[in-house]
């Protein structure tokens, strides 16, 4: 199974399944001499951890990262950084009823058809549990990019949308509520709606917006490796993601060029930022901002019609512990994938000219 690695110079390879002994990863290409704050890495993991509030899955995992190599006396050695996160709270029996049944809109059918075998326990390799490894690597990437800030937050849940420009928001409010919305009033409304959805045995989608500040000019490569293209790939690789837009996004299609152009100031900055901090696939020093769309979780506590591996029509109902809405826990994942992209291009940019 290829496709388990991300990045060129700052490269992450992950391994493990949802109900296996552990998940883990190897980070290759991290420069030597970088001081690593392992407590900060763990704090980022805690933000993604299941069971942290009443509106997420109640699977209880400590998600404690254990570094195996590449860090000595608090600094990177330049060798591969290996780490594992042990799985502690698997309940594989919750999935015995889907051993031969395909859950609608899950990876069950496609994995079975492609590989002829699948780990049905929690989705195996297709589970979002794998994203914990991305958070570890992304946290280290953020520490390498010390001057760059990454702030992701929930901007909508279902039809409840935060209609404010990010410049009007106080990012310090993000972690003060379980939804991770920086507007306290909207956060309460979103939280109540998620609880209502959970009570119905249903799920709901939403969006996560990310704002990256103090980005160096020059990150990204022309043509096929544009910065926004790699950000899009990174975000679309996250479980349940259905869409990605940056800068003016689809709203830009409704504007005239005379309205959309970002005019320069004499210092090279721009008076507006509809480009989203990227021009010609290369960062221009302005804020990079984008939005990621997440679908409703496919596992429902309601009865659904589906088929089994023999092609027979059957009825199934979800069991186990699942998120009614993934966006609150997706916030640190979005930040981490953005950090991996920028860290990779930061190292590549070091070789762009002599």
Swiss-Prot record:
Keywords: Amino-acid biosynthesis, Aromatic amino acid biosynthesis, FAD, Flavoprotein, FMN, Lyase, NADP. Pathway: Metabolic intermediate biosynthesis; chorismate biosynthesis; chorismate from D-erythrose 4-phosphate and phosphoenolpyruvate: step 7/7. Pfam families: Chorismate_synt. GO terms for cellular component: cytosol. It catalyses: 5-O-(1-carboxyvinyl)-3-phosphoshikimate = chorismate + phosphate. FMN binds at residues 125-127, 239-240, 280, 295-299, 321. NADP(+) binds at residue 48. Its EC number is 4.2.3.5. One of its GO terms (molecular function) is chorismate synthase activity. Belongs to the chorismate synthase family. Homotetramer. This is Chorismate synthase.
């Amino acid at each position: 199974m290829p496709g388990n690695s991300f990045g060129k110079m700052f490269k992450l390879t992950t391994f493990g399944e949802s109900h296996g002994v552990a998940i883990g990863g190897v980070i290759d290409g991290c420069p030597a001499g970088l001081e690593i704050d392992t407590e900060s890495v763990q704090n980022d993991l805690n933000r993604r951890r299941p069971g942290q509030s009443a509106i997420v899955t109640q699977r209880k995992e400590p998600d404690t990262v254990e570094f195996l190599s590449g860090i000595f006396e608090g600094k990177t050695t330049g060798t591969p950084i290996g780490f594992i996160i042990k799985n502690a709270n698997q309940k594989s029996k919750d999935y015995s009823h889907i051993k031969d049944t395909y859950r609608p809109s899950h990876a069950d059918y496609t994995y079975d058809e492609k590989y002829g075998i699948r780990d049905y326990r929690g989705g195996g390799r297709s589970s979002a549990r794998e994203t914990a490894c991305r958070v570890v690597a992304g946290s280290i990437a953020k520490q390498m990019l010390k001057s760059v800030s990454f702030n992701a937050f929930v901007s909508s849940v279902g039809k409840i949308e935060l209609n404010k420009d990010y410049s009007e928001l106080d990012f310090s409010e993000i972690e003060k509520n379980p939804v991770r919305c920086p507007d306290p009033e909207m956060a309460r409304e979103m939280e109540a709606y998620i609880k209502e959805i959970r009570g119905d045995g249903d799920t709901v989608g939403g969006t996560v917006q990310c704002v990256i500040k103090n980005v160096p000019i020059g990150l990204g490569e022309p043509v096929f490796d544009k910065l926004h293209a790699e950000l899009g790939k990174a975000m679309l690789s996250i479980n349940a993601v259905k869409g990605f837009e940056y800068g003016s996004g689809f709203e830009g299609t409704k504007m005239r060029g005379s309205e959309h152009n970002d005019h320069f100031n004499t210092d090279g900055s721009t008076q507006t930022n509809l480009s989203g901090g990227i021009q010609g696939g290369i960062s221009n020093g302005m804020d990079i901002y984008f939005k990621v769309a997440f679908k409703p979780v496919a596992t429902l506590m309601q009865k659904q019609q589906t088929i089994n591996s023999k092609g027979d029509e059957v009825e199934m109902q979800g069991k186990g512990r699942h998120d009614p809405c993934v966006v609150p826990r997706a916030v640190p994942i979005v930040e981490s994938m953005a950090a991996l992209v920028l860290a990779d291009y930061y190292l590549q940019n070091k070789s762009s000219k002599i």
